[in-house]
Amino acid sequence: MYKSQYISGQREKFVRLDDIDSSSSPATGMMMQRNCFGFNLKNRGGEKKKASKSFREGVKKIRSEGLITIGKSVTRAVFPEDLRITEKKIFDPQDKTLLVWNRLFVISCILAVSVDPLFFYLPIVDNSGSSCIGIDTKLAVTTTTLRTIVDVFYLTRMALQFRTAYIAPSSRVFGRGELVIDPAKIAERYLTRYFVVDFLAVLPLPQIAVWKFLHGSKGSDVLPTKTALLNIVIVQYIPRFVRFIPLTSELKKTAGAFAEGAWAGAAYYLLWYMLASHITGAFWYMLSVERNDTCWRFACKVQPDPRLCVQILYCGTKFVSSGETEWIKTVPELLKSNCSAKADDSKFNYGIYGQAISSGIVSSTTFFSKFCYCLWWGLQNLSTLGQGLQTSTFPGEVLFSIAIAIAGLLLFALLIGNMQTYLQSLTVRLEEMRIKRRDSEQWMHHRSLPQNLRERVRRYDQYKWLETRGVDEENIVQSLPKDLRRDIKRHLCLNLVRRVPLFANMDERLLDAICERLKPSLFTESTYIVREGDPVNEMMFIIRGRLESVTTDGGRSGFFNRGLLKEGDFCGEELLTWALDPKAGSNLPSSTRTVKALTEVEAFALEAEELKFVASQFRRLHSRQVQQTFRFYSQQWRTWASCFIQAAWRRYSRRKNAELRRIEEKEEELGYEDEYDDESDKRPMVITRSESSSRLRSTIFASRFAANALKGHRLRSSESSKTLINLQKPPEPDFDAE
């Protein structure tokens, strides 16, 4: 079977495993080459038949011919993806389905640990008629059924252990390693490690003891059944807990954690704390019945027939003699007088079990009330470390109290501590933010910053917290593989970049390159993004918010231009001109505008070096369509275009007005000459020729002086208008660079 991989941009084929004829001599010069993706086995000379069998054929021949051992280390070692082609179902330990089953098995182990203490509730003290100790048959049937169901799940898990591959220890040099899929090796490994523990844990010993009692003579089997259940459950707890620890650790290695959420993790550890309380309460109930039985036995020692008195302490004992029956009727009164836990002058000290005897829990037939009371007793004493327990001098009782105190300490140190860690993880970011704010306030107070600067710092911290919740998104993304990082950036930024008109019609490769290099930026109100004359080190693409863009054309007096930037606009276009210029040096261009945030602004920033790289790698930026789009949406080009149009309009208006004035002047001159001719005809002939010529010359001089004065005024006004509109054209990006 061949597997293809891409190495250094080329497609290579590698052989996973080959079946080599066992008849070939070792001296045939077999050469084995190990690659980083598999094994490549080649034979030289003396071959009797070819060793080009596929991996699937090798799996079929496993029963008869065996396997080739490579270096006596890894037998039938493959990679996880090769498990899918095997005919026999072998599970990958990190398979999702197997992880779900492992979680179910962990839950079944928890249920098994919680079901076993229910056997302690089977003994019951009957004080209704004759005082005796019996077995609750209904609860016995229910408990054995639950235990059998849990054991079925446990047996299923044991069966899966024979079909779950494991990682070969010799292949853990680099990466995850190779999986051993040989069923014989898997079975050998499981049988030598955990099979004995699993077998002891799943033995149906409690079911056998209860079944024997239910189908036996009952009366004579109460004491052996009670003793057997106590010993069996305690003994089987050891392998169950021993097997549960590696199961949870294995689940953490493959899945990371049993509960991923904070509340789920807290509930998981709280469940274990409640389970410990349940076990403690069940032990307390069983030991209470034992102490009651001990008191009755002490009372029977003073009777004429102690042996017969002990026999009647267990319900179901049959007697034939009428004399014995009459004597038995007096025994309950005797037991109550000697073993009453309510009397102040009781002859027997029950110690910590007196509460169970006096409350009637041991004689109650209602399981739910009995279970809740014992659960509360266990939870109360584990939480208080057994401080309220008043023990007697009985050694078993004292040891049980010591065990409660130690268990309480361990639970607080482990379970409650882990639960607190999970709950604190919900507010750890908030606590970090509070610490940073406190440090910031102390620093500002130490440096005596003015109130307006302090308010700006507080506003920025608050805005950044609301937007990111204390998560450093950039570090999270940068820690991922390149391919995954590119896909995440594409998902987050592609639609936003396409909303920028400059990149609306770009191809996918260019958009991916831009998205991969964008960095999120946040700005609060009244923050200056860039000032006029400062170097432009990044190009900003506005995602949300409004900004003000102002220019004075280098501080020219009387010149002021203001524009608004909104969602979809960009600033720092001087950087694009610099990036598209192949002859541009390392000096960054100066900003021609001052950009100030009017509201809270979210934007993506493209740094100078990143933009230079994108412009040099993608020729799509060097197109006329991009040139027109850049000019249309550039604030610098808009300002120049508006000034250019205004200047052209003024020139046109000036020429139009000059033409109108020339027409008016001609009309005035013609009208003046006509009026002068009419007045000359009406005058008397006495006027001499000399007087007429002198007046005409004066009129001509006056009209010329007025025309020259108007012309000078127009020239001065035109020169002043030229100085107002003389705005330098923005530099043209080199879109034709190749």
Curated annotation (Swiss-Prot):
Membrane topology: Multi-pass membrane protein
Residue ranges, annotated region (Disordered): 671-693, 715-738
InterPro entries recorded: cNMP-bd_dom (IPR000595), cNMP-bd_dom_sf (IPR018490), Ion_trans_dom (IPR005821), K_chnl_volt-dep_EAG/ELK/ERG (IPR003938), RmlC-like_jellyroll (IPR014710)
Domain notes: The binding of calmodulin to the C-terminus might interfere with cyclic nucleotide binding and thus channel activation.
Subunit structure: Homotetramer or heterotetramer.
GO molecular function: calmodulin binding; cAMP binding; cGMP binding; voltage-gated potassium channel activity
SMART domains attached to this UniProt entry: cNMP
A biological process from GO: pollen tube growth
Name of the protein in its database record: Putative cyclic nucleotide-gated ion channel 7
Alphabetized UniProt keyword annotations: Calmodulin-binding, cAMP, cAMP-binding, Cell membrane, cGMP, cGMP-binding, Ion channel, Ion transport, Ligand-gated ion channel, Membrane, Nucleotide-binding, Transmembrane, Transmembrane helix, Transport
Domain of life: Eukaryota
Residue ranges crossing the lipid bilayer per the database entry: 105-125, 140-160, 194-214, 228-248, 269-289, 396-416
Listed GO CC annotations: plasma membrane; pollen tube
